[in-house]
Regions:
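Alpha-helical coiled-coil scaffolding segments
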Residues: 1-224
Length: 224
């Protein structure tokens, strides 16, 4: 595995920043639980609860709608590694190249590798209607957001941090898909907390998207 290459890539994206790690653990845990709850379970500590591979395999089954190979139920380390490998092999079968994420790191509870794996799963399975092959998954997600929000005043999505601080991009995405849920014309850049809370409340109540982000965190952090 080329750990150096992966770490450099994650460093550019801010994934190695301690504040990012804390926020992403919270966000990714909420995302995982929004799917795992459909199978009657959940996780609490993201780097611990995927270590035996069972909930990781279950998560992939829930979000893909496809069965994975039968998991090993043994408690030994090699059973856990076998289960995580089944999950990783499934992800790779979907055309995702896992540069440096190995089963051992997940079984050992490596926070950075676990977050990187979940981020990879989100990009591959949560954003499926973008097929610009030459772009990275992150760039495809950015392009999708730009396309959806292009018609809206005061929205200019250039990144995944400062472009979202005033809440208008979130509101624009909701309005683009469900215009009856909010009146975009009444929103202003001057009230970011209102915009963010409105978007998150509507997403949770009407779109079944769990509230994963905190409006105050986004508004007051230098680079959310």
């Amino acid at each position: 595995y080329d750990y150096t290459q992966q770490e450099e890539e994650w460093d550019r994206e801010g994934l190695l920043d301690p504040a990012w790690e804390k926020q992403q653990k919270k966000t990714f845990t909420a995302w995982c639980n929004s799917h795992l709850r459909k199978a009657g379970t959940s996780i609490e500590v993201i780097e611990e609860d995927f270590r035996n591979g069972l909930k990781l395999m279950l998560l992939l089954e829930v979000i893909s709608g496809e069965p994975l190979p039968r998991p090993d139920r043994g408690k030994m380390r090699f059973h856990k590694i076998a289960n995580v490998n089944k999950a990783l092999e499934y992800i790779e079968s979907k055309g995702v190249k896992l540069v440096s994420i190995g089963a051992e790191e997940i079984v050992d509870g490596n926070v950075k590798m676990t977050l990187g794996l979940i981020w990879t799963i989100i990009l591959r399975f949560a954003i499926q209607d973008i097929n610009v092959e030459e772009l990275s998954a992150r760039d495809r997600l950015l392009l999708w957001c730009q396309r959806k929000t292009a018609p809206y005043d005061n929205v200019n999505v250039q990144n995944f941090h400062t472009s979202w601080k005033d809440g208008l991009a979130f509101c624009a995405l909701i309005h683009r898909h469900r215009p009856e849920l909010l009146d975009y014309s009444k929103l202003t850049k001057a009230d970011p907390l209102h915009n963010l809370n409105l978007a998150f409340e509507i997403a949770e109540k009407h779109l079944d998207i769990p509230r994963m982000l905190d409006a105050e965190d986004l508004v007051y952090s230098q680079k959310p």
